[in-house]
């Protein structure tokens, strides 16, 4: 089993320079009141490491309503609080593993029993998103993390798997590690690559603006 303190330090180091989106870009969904209410406690918070676990746990639904950038920035606060066993409701493991394995559930309907597939191969909402599955959705959302951040997340998931009682979540965690996180940690874009891209974009825009002047 991985040493918990090493995993905690791994997370701190991997996310120490992660860019924070502006407040206007923290919220992903704008349907109804719940997304805005869920994300509101994070508005104006300039440093994820300063968030108290009690606030994180009370704001557990924010994990579902953050934008990709907001999720990336504030996730490490949830991971550390979870490793320190300070969360009662928030479940970062689910957010990092959902969409990589299938489950069958049976739903009684009168004299019939309806079998439904949930997870990886299930459609998100065909009327709105066509053939997009939860696997497609998960890979899109989680691709926001750099190679270094993905490595820290993989270490967290491995620790949670090994420390879990009675093997709870082990199957889902292994499916996610094999299907996404280990590859992302080995081959994903690095933090340096992202920084260089942003620098080049800024220089290009500055040059274009200068030429137009």
Indicate residue ranges for each PLM-predicted region:
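Alpha-helical solenoid scaffolds in large eukaryotic transport, assembly, and signaling factors
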Residues: 2-4, 9-116, 121-129, 139-148, ...
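Intrinsically disordered, low-complexity, charge-dense segments enriched in Lys/Arg
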Residues: 108-213
């Amino acid at each position: 089993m991985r040493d918990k303190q090493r995993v905690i330090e791994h997370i701190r180091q991997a996310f120490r320079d992660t860019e924070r989106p502006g407040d206007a870009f923290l919220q992903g969904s704008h349907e109804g009141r719940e997304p805005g209410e869920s994300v509101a406690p994070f508005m104006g918070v300039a440093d994820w490491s300063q968030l108290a676990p009690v606030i994180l746990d009370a704001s557990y639904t924010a994990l579902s309503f953050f934008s990709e950038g907001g999720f990336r920035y504030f996730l490490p606060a949830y991971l550390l609080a979870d490793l320190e066993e300070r969360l009662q409701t928030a479940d970062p493991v689910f957010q990092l593993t959902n969409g990589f394995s299938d489950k069958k559930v049976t739903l009684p309907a009168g004299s019939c029993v309806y079998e439904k597939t949930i997870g990886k191969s299930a459609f998100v909402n065909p009327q709105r998103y066509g053939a997009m599955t939860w696997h497609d959705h998960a890979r899109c959302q989680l691709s926001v993390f750099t190679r270094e951040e993905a490595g820290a997340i993989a270490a967290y998931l491995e620790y949670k798997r090994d420390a879990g009682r009675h093997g709870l979540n082990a199957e889902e965690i292994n499916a996610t590690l094999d299907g996404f996180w280990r590859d992302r940690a080995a081959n994903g874009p690095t933090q340096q690559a992202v920084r260089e891209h942003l620098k080049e974009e800024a220089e290009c825009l500055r040059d274009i603006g200068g030429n137009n002047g």
